[in-house]
Regions:
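Juxtamembrane intracellular "pre-TM" segments in multi-pass secondary transporters
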Residues: 177-205
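Cytoplasmic helix-loop-helix junction between adjacent transmembrane helices
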Residues: 94-133
Length: 388
């Protein structure tokens, strides 16, 4: 089930994030300026925001298999449709609709992993599942630009279409919904809205929003920082970004394993928040004094700032329970995506008006604000013994 969850989410991310690799072709062949091409590339993400919570509700009602199969099939259909039309307006509409469908994988694959693995293994397996995003971005980067350059935008869009179609078939054939009692036989406390009478889930959402700010800044501006501030070539900067993404994926897995061993999801989140604040603060200082160490610090920040993602995701699924976790995970993803949409223009303006060091220093404040909000006392593993 872990392999299927990883594969379906990876294929969805090839569609969601892979459109960004069409920007050079849209700019050169379709005459779009970079702002217009960037808007086209963002349409799948905008579509996701609209439906994440709705897909979570469907997962809670009908299970993971149906949602993964139908969602992947609809994503494939939208990608095939986008590849079949010439009008950029029509392409944009289908990309938006595809994003709405691709959102299905986020909540469903997360619940699939949590449902089939015991508590002492969930951190590790969720960390592995969380690597779907960087792996999907990497796969898209390897294939889509070359297809677009050699055969055009339509041919390039066929790649995520075929990938998502394959994911739909695999989900329909291979997914087995994790066991849970029928709603009629469930305990009353399992059916109660976990957001009522408790601030725990809201606090985790807030912490995740605050921690996604440095993550988004690092991922968005590392390339341009290396090229304009550190004087690197585009090829060298791109290679460094790829290297940092790979390390970030490994960091998510390591953080998950760490949480399993210590028997806590939220204590590690708090420690990671401290690490993120320190890393961003050091980055601001080393960049201000033009130290060559700033590049190593940026790599460390690239790893630390993404390491909490799987832990928060797992904690939310465990706290919300089998009848509410789909909606809770949808809410988590929606809040993070909205934040990720706001951060680049805001910090881009700050960098333009001031400097990179000031932007990095401001970033360091967000993890510090998150520290007192981490609901450590409500940790879902507080009654589980650490593993050995």
């Amino acid at each position: 089930m872990l392999v299927i969850a990883l594969a379906t989410t990876l294929c969805a991310n090839v569609f969601i994030n892979g459109v960004a690799f069409l920007i050079p072709t849209l700019h050169a062949e379709r005459g779009l300026d970079l702002a217009e091409a960037g808007l086209v590339s963002a349409l799948p993400s905008f579509g996701m925001v609209v439906t994440l919570i709705a897909w979570g509700y469907l997962v809670d009602r009908f299970g993971e298999r149906i949602v993964l199969a139908v969602g992947s099939a609809l994503t494939a259909a939208a990608a095939f449709a986008a590849a079949s039309v010439d009008s950029l307006v029509a392409v944009g509409i289908f990309l938006f609709l595809g994003g709405m469908a691709a959102a299905s994988s986020n909540s469903a694959s997360g619940r699939l992993v949590v449902g089939w693995f015991p508590p002492h293994q969930r951190g590790l397996v969720m960390g592995i599942r969380q690597t779907a995003q960087p792996l999907g971005v990497g796969l898209g980067a390897l294939v889509i630009p070359q297809l677009a350059q050699s055969s055009g935008v339509s041919a390039a869009l066929l790649f995520p279409a075929i990938a998502c179609a394959a994911a739909a078939v695999v989900s329909a054939v291979g997914v087995v919904d994790p066991p849970r009692p029928p709603r009629a036989e469930a305990r009353p406390e399992d059916l109660v809205n976990p957001y009522r009478g408790s601030s725990t889930l809201w606090r985790i959402h807030a912490v995740s929003v605050l921690l996604v700010v440095p993550q988004c800044v690092v991922w968005t501006f590392t390339l341009v920082w290396l090229m304009t501030d550190r004087g690197w070539s585009a090829a060298s900067a791109g290679a460094m970004v790829t290297f940092a993404q790979i390390l970030g994926a490994a960091g998510r897995i390591a953080a998950g394993r760490w949480s399993d061993k210590v028997g806590s999801r939220l204590h590690p989140v708090r420690t990671i928040a401290i690490g993120a604040a320190v890393a961003m603060g050091l980055l601001a200082v080393t960049d201000l004094i033009h130290s060559p160490l700033s590049i190593a610090v940026m790599v460390v920040a690239s790893v630390v700032t993404v390491s909490d993602n799987g832990l928060a995701f797992t904690a939310i699924a465990e706290l919300a329970g089998p009848f509410w976790s789909g909606r809770a995970l949808g809410t988590q993803n929606t809040s993070q995506l909205l934040t990720a949409g706001i951060v680049p223009p805001v910090f881009g303006a700050l960098i333009t008006m001031a400097s990179f060091p000031l932007a990095f220093a401001v970033c360091a404040l967000f993890p510090l604000i998150a520290l007192p909000l981490v609901p450590v006392a409500a940790d879902p593993l507080r009654n589980q013994p650490p593993t050995t």
